[in-house]
Amino acid sequence: MSNNNIAFTFASSEVNKLGQNFIKITELCTGKLKLKSLYDQYLKENNPPENFWHDAIKKLELNIIPYFHSVENIPKTGRLIVVANHAFGVADGVTICSLISKVRQDYKLITHKVLRQAEAVKDKIIPLDFTSSKEAIHSNIKSRKHAEEVLLDDGVIVLFPAGAISTKKKIKT
């Protein structure tokens, strides 16, 4: 399938060493090694990329109990923006994307750029860069335009707001 030597961390987006180290320690304490191991297993299985979200649910051993008829409530056509809280981290994102992908293939997930390293979902991710560099600002403007294009084409945008890090006082386009 793809190279499993991806940078499996969010620490690279932090500009100062203290922040980087804090994130690395937090990742190690909250299951990063287990997630990396599951991802490496997934790569060895060489599964079709379109099944990534469903395969992830199996690998993570998630027992998904959809609320009422959640899949049936997803419109099959037309513009759609899905905004969801993600109190359970990766499990929430995997679950939402799995449900959406059962109905639609014209979806894009706006998320941290580090997640775009997963080859199976690279084309489904619109990356955000949370650093304060000029390159990050230009990249994020490009991502915003990409999201607008998806919606203008009657596609689906999925996003998980992250509070303070998802806001910027002013961005010039």
Regions found by a protein language model. Name each.
Residues 63-173:
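Soluble catalytic domains of membrane acyltransferases
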